[in-house]
């Protein structure tokens, strides 16, 4: 989801180095040092305005969270939420999801979240989808053996594509929700996008898969 350019976004990020890691390549292999503890590390690729990552951090203080987004303005809004919530277990990165191995050692990340990723519906753009096999190669490297990905979307086409992509890659589809908000699942933390469109009756799909 594209967001209008925000004036002062770059300065906002630069002025908060405690939360925004400006040179994440220097943290590769030492993220536990960055957080100052050895708690599990969960990352969200495409963190948007930060509602999910902040909500998860508040709910699970014993887990370290890293929100990743390439859009400058979007990440600045996520920083607003992190600052307002005063969580101590969140860091933010402005990097591309295809380059994660530049910032994380093999097996350094314990779990991944992909929420409402761009569906890139045109066939010629398949390689840009975050559940395309090349991305899965990257995720498998930075996750531990049998590492988990939790994926949510409101786009039926992307969901079906992702289920097929996970399966063809040899991943295990542990649990699938075809209408998350109509289910009895109690652990859901909503993104801003999810809250907006589910209130309009949009069905939300979810899957937990592991390598």
Curated annotation (Swiss-Prot):
Catalytic residues, chain numbering: 118
Keywords: Methyltransferase, S-adenosyl-L-methionine, Transferase, tRNA processing
Keyword ATP-binding: no
Binding site for S-adenosyl-L-methionine: 44, 69, 96, 118
UniProt cross-references to InterPro entries, sorted A to Z: SAM-dependent_MTases_sf, tRNA_(Gua-N-7)_MeTrfase_Trmb, tRNA_methyltr_TrmB_bact
Keyword Transferase assigned: yes
Region (Interaction with RNA), start-end ranges: 124-129
Catalytic reaction(s) noted: guanosine(46) in tRNA + S-adenosyl-L-methionine = N(7)-methylguanosine(46) in tRNA + S-adenosyl-L-homocysteine
A Pfam family this chain is assigned to: Methyltransf_4
Pathway: tRNA modification; N(7)-methylguanine-tRNA biosynthesis
GO cellular component: tRNA methyltransferase complex
Enzyme class at the top of the EC tree: transferase
EC number: 2.1.1.33
Binding residues for substrate: 122, 154, 191-194
GO molecular function, one term: tRNA (guanine(46)-N7)-methyltransferase activity
HAMAP family: tRNA_methyltr_TrmB
Biological function: Catalyzes the formation of N(7)-methylguanine at position 46 (m7G46) in tRNA.
The family this protein is said to belong to: Belongs to the class I-like SAM-binding methyltransferase superfamily. TrmB family.
NCBIfam families the record matches: PRK00121.2-2, tRNA (guanosine(46)-N7)-methyltransferase TrmB
Protein name: tRNA (guanine-N(7)-)-methyltransferase
Organism the protein comes from: Streptococcus pyogenes serotype M6 (strain ATCC BAA-946 / MGAS10394)
Lineage: Bacteria, Bacillati, Bacillota, Bacilli, Lactobacillales
